[in-house]
Design a protein with these regions (language model features):
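General marker for long, soluble alpha-helical cores
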Residues: 1-136
Length: 136
């Protein structure tokens, strides 16, 4: 891990009062490093403050490094905050990460939050199918 990543970790811990180093033992190393490299400190702080650590850990276990680096940070925060991680995992099993990245990039913030709050797996599958595979 490089010095810049360590400094970001320390800054997030200072700003949130929570230890994020505990995440390392529970989350694939590449996911954590990618998150700290790709996501600005202010957004990391917001994630740690707005998403329970257990849910954040679960989300970082499921979401891939490519998704972390390619999904817009605001949408990634929506997924972590409003998503049922069991359904997120099921979507990961059904679709390629590329399909998920494309679909999420096409869905508006509001629609993404609505889909996640509704928490209906079939509706989410339909949304990914419509957005990832059609030229719209």
């Amino acid at each position: 891990m490089d010095l810049e990543t360590l400094n970001k970790i320390q800054e997030v811990e200072k700003d949130t009062g929570q230890s994020v180093l505990s995440i390392y033992s529970k989350v694939p190393f590449g996911n954590v490093v990618t998150a700290f490299r790709e996501i600005p400190v202010s957004d990391l702080v917001d994630m740690v403050k707005s998403v329970p650590i257990t849910k954040l850990v679960e989300g970082l276990q499921i979401i891939t490094p490519n998704e972390i680096s390619q999904i817009e940070v605001k949408k990634l925060k929506i997924v972590l905050k409003y998503g049922d991680m069991n359904n997120v995992a099921k979507l990961q099993e059904k679709f390629s990460e590329r399909s998920i990245i494309i679909a999420i990039s096409k869905i508006s913030y509001r629609r993404l939050q609505e889909l996640l709050e509704r928490n209906n797996l079939d509706v989410m599958i339909d949304a990914i199918n419509r957005n990832a595979f059609l030229n719209n």
